């Protein structure tokens, strides 16, 4: 899971073990953080628009299974799934 929100959003609550790469840095940092392009990569933001942009960049970079967490962190929290604060 790759969280593409800004640092303050990520710190306020994120999915356990999610990697943090702000959307503006995704093209540069994704290949450093997720080296295996065959594995699924799930992008998350607040509601999905930034994740969708990250998914498009990942496809351009050759990732085979980039996905978007539908509804983003709002949907995750609304489903009472665990959130970690840092």
Q: Model regions: which residues?
A:
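Rhodanese-like catalytic fold shared by cysteine-dependent sulfurtransferases
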Residues: 7-42, 46-86
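Structural scaffold elements adjacent to functional motifs in cytosolic proteins
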Residues: 1-3
């Amino acid at each position: 899971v790759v969280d593409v929100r800004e640092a303050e959003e990520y710190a306020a609550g994120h999915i356990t073990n999610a990697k943090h790469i702000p959307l503006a840095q995704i093209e540069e940092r994704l290949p450093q953080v997720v080296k295996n392009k065959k594995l699924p990569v799930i992008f998350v933001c607040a509601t999905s628009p930034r994740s969708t942009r990250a998914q498009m960049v990942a496809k351009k970079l050759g990732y085979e299974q980039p996905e978007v967490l539908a509804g983003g962190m709002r949907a995750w929290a609304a489903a009472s799934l665990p959130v970690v604060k840092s």
